[in-house]
């Protein structure tokens, strides 16, 4: 019989044994409740909230999601945050003006980051920084 799920702890144990990163983050998919005008009405407050999360070390990454043809934005976005638990992640997202106002709803999924690479390029002569 095919197995359809396994305990998350089994994955954590395997990752630890392999020496991989094993960094627990939370991915938030946030979607419009149907009215782009409602999203636009709170966009400035939302962006200020996001920058505050970033300054406090909570925000890992965030940004808008385009349509599949990459031509339009319909009010959706993805946020990746650092939190100690799913409950804390929910508390953080409930405080977002987008969700408080009802302009967007959200779904949170725990994400264990194991593989990948971050490359930062710094130009000494100009001070320019580039993330690749």
State where each predicted segment sits.
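Conserved, structured core segments of small domains
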Residues: 1-132
């Amino acid at each position: 019989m095919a197995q359809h799920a396994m305990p998350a702890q089994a994955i954590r144990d395997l990752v630890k044994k392999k020496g991989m990163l094993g960094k627990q983050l939370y991915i938030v998919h946030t979607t419009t409740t149907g009215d782009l005008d409602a999203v636009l009405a709170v966009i400035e407050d939302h962006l200020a909230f996001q920058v505050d999360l970033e300054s406090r070390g909570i925000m890992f990454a965030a940004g808008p999601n385009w349509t599949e043809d990459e031509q339009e934005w319909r009010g959706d976005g993805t946020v990746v945050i650092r939190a100690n638990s799913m409950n804390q992640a929910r508390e953080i997202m409930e405080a977002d003006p987008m969700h408080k106002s009802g302009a967007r709803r959200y779904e949170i999924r725990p994400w264990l980051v194991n593989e990948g690479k971050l490359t930062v390029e710094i130009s000494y002569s100009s001070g320019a920084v580039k993330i690749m």
